[in-house]
Amino acid sequence: MTDEPLRTLQFLLSRLERISADSAVAYRASGVRGSMLRMVEKLEEGKPVSGQDVKRLTDSAYLLLKKAAREKIR
């Protein structure tokens, strides 16, 4: 696997941790962040991860970031 999934996950982690604790999506974002952190650890250790799992987590993270952004502009 290339470094691209690792960089993407690290980018998303940095954005997810900025979601306000008062946000309606904060609890879910926390769970997604935990899963992403475990996946980043595996990637950094050189252990295999499923491309499908990476896609699922990145899709979830982008969706949560969109929801948090919509919530913020209201």
Q: What does each model-found stretch correspond to?
A:
Residues M1-R18, A24-Y27, G31, R38-R74:
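Long, non-catalytic architectural segments outside compact domain cores
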